[in-house]
């Protein structure tokens, strides 16, 4: 999905960031396990440490030392290393309920883990494929400025979707616990609470995006770039309507995982993040082109 102008930057960034892949995977996994261990605040602290470290090192490597894209990649990778160490240290403390111990491979358990994790896995993998397809379509029908607008929307979408993922992950273990205890009434009540919370979040995010579209866009694009700025604001406002529905897909998919129905969850995840997106992309570009 890169262009001739950005290909070298992409190569540099991907090469360096790939050196830290294991830390991205382990850090994210441990964050979820720490929450499951009953320490959600600690998990939040770990994420904040990673974010602050990333910002600080970006300033040092990119601005002070002038390392450019390579510096940004190293900053992100090192932040994940520190996050991984922080989360690992939790399981070495006495207060943790879960401990690091020797284990034997139980393929039945591993199969269960894979089946329950498959819906989220497909969603994550779909992001890369969809991004490539969108980049190619934007370059074909509009041009490089469209990639800038799309990048801005992707940043905002990530922030919004992660907020909604947080709500989903917050209610999932509670639903799973009550489902295992056969407390069906509690399961239904928790699901309703999750839906209501997601509804309030969706409405709030949508209204904020519409009201402050100009201000948010100005964080990424110089207002002096009038045409690019205005087109990004326009597209951003249109895209904001998707936030009204995004959270419900996430929480319903997460609910099915929590009650041990991964196939239903996988169907929703694949439809939301890949199948329907690709179909819509091809159909709408055929009908409307760059519009």
Regions found by a protein language model. Give the residues of each.
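Transmembrane helical elements of multi-pass membrane transporters/channels
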Residues: 16, 27, 50, 79-83, ...
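Hydrophobic/aromatic residues within transmembrane alpha-helices of membrane transport systems
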Residues: 10, 19, 34, 39, ...
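Short alpha-helical transmembrane segments in multi-pass integral membrane proteins
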Residues: 1-22, 64-118, 175-242, 284-291
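Structural signal for membrane-spanning alpha-helices in multi-pass inner-membrane proteins
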Residues: 32, 58, 62, 87-91, ...
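Short loop-to-helix capping motifs
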Residues: 3, 39-40, 68, 143, ...
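Small-residue-rich hydrophobic transmembrane alpha-helices
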Residues: 24-43, 149-207, 211-213, 246-265
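Short runs within selected transmembrane alpha-helices of multi-pass transporters and secretion channels
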Residues: 16-35, 43-54, 72-87, 165-168, ...
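Generic alpha-helical transmembrane segments of integral inner-membrane proteins
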Residues: 22, 26, 48-56, 60, ...
């Amino acid at each position: 999905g890169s262009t001739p102008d950005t290909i070298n930057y992409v190569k540099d960034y991907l090469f360096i960031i790939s050196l830290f892949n294991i830390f991205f995977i382990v850090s994210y996994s441990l964050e979820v396990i720490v929450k499951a261990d009953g320490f959600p605040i600690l998990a939040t602290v770990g994420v904040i440490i990673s974010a602050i470290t990333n910002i600080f090192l970006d300033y040092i490597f990119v601005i002070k030392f002038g390392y450019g894209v390579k510096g940004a990649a190293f900053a992100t990778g090192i932040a994940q290393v520190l996050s991984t160490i922080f989360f690992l240290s939790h399981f070495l403390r006495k207060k943790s309920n879960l401990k690091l111990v020797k284990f034997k491979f139980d393929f039945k358990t591993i199969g269960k883990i894979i089946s329950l994790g498959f819906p989220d896995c497909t969603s994550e993998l779909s992001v890369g494929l969809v991004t490539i397809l969108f980049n190619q379509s934007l370059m074909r029908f509009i041009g490089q400025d469209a990639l800038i607008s799309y990048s801005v929307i992707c940043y905002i979408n990530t922030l919004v979707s992660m907020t909604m993922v947080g709500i989903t992950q917050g209610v999932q273990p509670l639903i799973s616990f009550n489902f295992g205890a056969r407390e069906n009434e509690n399961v239904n009540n928790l699901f309703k609470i999750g839906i209501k919370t997601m509804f309030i979040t969706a409405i709030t995010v949508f209204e904020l995006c519409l009201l402050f579209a100009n201000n948010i866009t100005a964080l990424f694009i110089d207002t002096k770039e009038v045409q690019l700025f205005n087109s990004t604001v326009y597209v951003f406002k249109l895209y904001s309507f998707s936030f009204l529905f995004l959270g419900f897909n996430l929480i319903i998919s997460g609910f099915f995982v929590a009650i041990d129905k991964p196939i239903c969850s996988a169907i929703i995840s694949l439809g939301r993040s890949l199948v329907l997106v690709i179909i819509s992309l091809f159909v709408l570009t055929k009908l409307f082109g760059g519009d």
